Amino acid sequence: MSDAARPLDPDEAARRLGPWLGAGGQAGGVVLAVSGGPDSTALMGCAAALPPRVPVLVATVDHGLRPESGEEAAGVAALAGRLGLPHRILTWRGEKPRTRLQEAARAARYDLLLGLAREAGAGAILTAHTLDDQAETVLMRLCAGSGPAGLAGIAPARRLGGLLLGRPFLDLPKARLVATCAAAGWPFAVDPGNAAARFARARLRRVMPLLAAEGLTPARLARLAARLRRNEAALAAAAEAARPSLAAAPAGPGRLALDAAGLAALPEAVALRVLADAIAALRAGERRPERLERLEEALFGRILPAIAAGTPLRLTLGGALLDLAGGRLLLAPEPPRRRTKRAG
Ligand SMILES: Nc1ncnc2c1ncn2[C@@H]1O[C@H](COP(=O)(O)OP(=O)(O)OP(=O)(O)O)[C@@H](O)[C@H]1O
């Protein structure tokens, strides 16, 4: 059997899940997010086989978006019962948006899982994201023009609402999880959305074999994500360390000021990060971060050349008004747009 499609053996499963679920794992136990697909079914099966372990609660979110979703959730409940694990179905109620439905479904899913984990006193939520998910995410973000932060992909572990969100299978090929289910006789569902060409992820999945033939394998894309995650941490630290040397006279409440010469003296990647962070701090929570490509155009195409030439500059970027004058780059929230008066 090829290594890429070998079922997980109990030792390997224990090594991966032990830190989360083992005797010394998460105090209060964990919630397993199980959709009923092969990846999360394998997560549930492997967790059930792990002795001894902290309390485990399995949760399936029924988004109510496909006619068969209720049946799938019931299928997970049945298998959880067979495996001796408690199971809950969480239903996404309320208005479903017409646009960005997948994004809204994901946000609702994490909210529901978090609510359950808090109610159960669990310390962590585990999902079954795989190396294939990671590779697809990186590819999708590459297509969308993401920078290092986006290309760092799915985090192996991160904080979520005061709890931990873990992905213990993130470096495992999906084929191994499918093989694990098959070998153990755990039934799983196949999401038709996975093949629907109207979703970008599904379209990219079809391109994957072509890219792999050229050397851009899922494993390589996943390694790129891990590498960029390390670089991203270094960049964040460098931007943080540069901040004191950039402090310029405060520009009034709700405003920021950066020393222009100091900004220009930084390595370009650090300067870009400082600018992005400053705009994000100014517009906290009010809008989505500006596209990296626009930030790059503004910084490298206009702001740094103006600093070098000593010329003043005004521009709006990411909801902020930037004003370069007197050796300072002032940032203020962009004023509400005025209607242009129609002549005559
Ligand atoms: N309906 C669901 N109920 C419970 N868990 C789910 C559900 N859908 C997905 N998950 C969890 O999320 C993991 C990833 O699923 P999938 O790739 O379909 O979601 P995604 O939308 O890409 O998720 P993410 O936004 O977290 O990347 C699954 O392995 C599972 O652990």
UniProtKB/Swiss-Prot annotation:
Task: Report one GO cellular component.
Answer: cytoplasm
> Where can this protein be found?
Cytoplasm
Q: Name one Pfam family in it.
A: ATP_bind_3
Listed GO biological process terms: tRNA modification
InterPro entries found in the cross-reference section: Rossmann-like_a/b/a_fold (IPR014729), TilS/TtcA_N (IPR011063), tRNA_Ile_lys_synt (IPR012094), tRNA_Ile_lys_synt_N (IPR012795)
**Reactions this protein catalyses:** cytidine(34) in tRNA(Ile2) + L-lysine + ATP = lysidine(34) in tRNA(Ile2) + AMP + diphosphate + H(+)
Member of which family?
A: Belongs to the tRNA(Ile)-lysidine synthase family.
The text the record gives for the protein's domains is: The N-terminal region contains the highly conserved SGGXDS motif, predicted to be a P-loop motif involved in ATP binding.
Q: Please give the function described in this protein's UniProt entry.
A: Ligates lysine onto the cytidine present at position 34 of the AUA codon-specific tRNA(Ile) that contains the anticodon CAU, in an ATP-dependent manner. Cytidine is converted to lysidine, thus changing the amino acid specificity of the tRNA from methionine to isoleucine.
- Its recorded name reads tRNA(Ile)-lysidine synthase
Name its species. Answer: Methylobacterium sp. (strain 4-46)
Q: Gene encoding it?
A: tilS
